[in-house]
């Protein structure tokens, strides 16, 4: 068991693209499985396969290329470079990733209007992401070596995937809807929130 970390480190150095893509895909897919479990539903492996397909074919590859592009365009860890990377990531990268998720999942689910979820949930999800991803990426850009950035984003993406997969299935793209389902899981829908 102790030999897995050196083997993973070697794989990331020798084959950074597939190692990062597979790690990212595995972690985000696990996030989908977790959100199903948190809702008390039976495992829907078909849904998790859809998430895995989308993440491995687009998101993990996009993140791998995007993070390296940001590093080339804005090299270093100086405060101005970090701020510029964060700004570019949130203004350009985040909208692409959120849009691709909602449209991609709608395509894989065979929905008639593949843009409906995007229209209904984009802004809420994007604004929710602004409360999470800048902190993740600040750590990523300032502390994580380039060859591990996609994998690190995948680790943090596990939590994000739990949220965004829930939003795509049941929520409205806000953190409030995700927390509400956790709260109401133990109470009936008629009981509502505790009175103050």
From Swiss-Prot:
It holds the Pfam family Mpv17_PMP22. GO terms for cellular component: cytoplasm; intracellular membrane-bounded organelle; mitochondrion; peroxisomal membrane; peroxisome. Residues 16-55 are annotated as: Targeting to peroxisomes. Residues 1-16, 68-90, 168-196 are cytoplasmic. Isoform 1 is detected in the kidney (at protein level). Isoform 1 and isoform 2 are expressed in the kidney, heart, liver, lung, pancreas and skeletal muscle. It comes from the Eukaryota. The chain crosses the membrane at residues 17-34, 51-67, 91-108, 151-167. GO terms for biological process: mitochondrial ribosome assembly; negative regulation of hydrogen peroxide biosynthetic process; negative regulation of mitochondrial outer membrane permeabilization involved in apoptotic signaling pathway; reactive oxygen species metabolic process. Keywords: Membrane, Peroxisome, Transmembrane, Transmembrane helix. Residues 35-50, 109-150 are lumenal. InterPro entries: Mpv17_PMP22. Belongs to the peroxisomal membrane protein PXMP2/4 family. This is Mpv17-like protein. It comes from Homo sapiens (Human). The gene is MPV17L.
């Amino acid at each position: 068991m102790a030999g897995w970390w050196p083997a993973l480190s070697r794989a990331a150095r020798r084959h950074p693209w597939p190692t990062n893509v597979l790690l990212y895909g595995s972690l985000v897919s696990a996030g989908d499985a977790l959100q199903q479990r948190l809702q008390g539903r039976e495992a829907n492996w078909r849904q998790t396969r859809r998430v895995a397909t989308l993440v491995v074919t687009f998101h993990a590859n996009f993140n791998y290329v995007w993070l390296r592009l940001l590093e080339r365009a804005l090299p270093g860890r100086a405060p101005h470079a970090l701020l510029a990377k964060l700004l570019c990531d949130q203004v350009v990268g985040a909208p692409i990733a959120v849009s691709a998720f909602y449209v991609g999942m709608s395509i894989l689910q065979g929905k008639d209007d593949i843009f409906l979820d995007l229209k209904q949930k984009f802004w809420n999800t994007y604004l929710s992401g602004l409360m999470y991803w800048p902190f993740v990426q600040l750590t990523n850009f300032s502390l994580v070596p380039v060859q591990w950035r996609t994998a690190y984003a995948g680790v943090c993406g596990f939590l994000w995937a739990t949220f965004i997969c829930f939003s795509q299935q049941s929520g409205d793209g806000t953190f409030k809807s995700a927390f509400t389902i956790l709260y109401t899981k133990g109470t009936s829908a008629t009981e509502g929130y505790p009175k103050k």
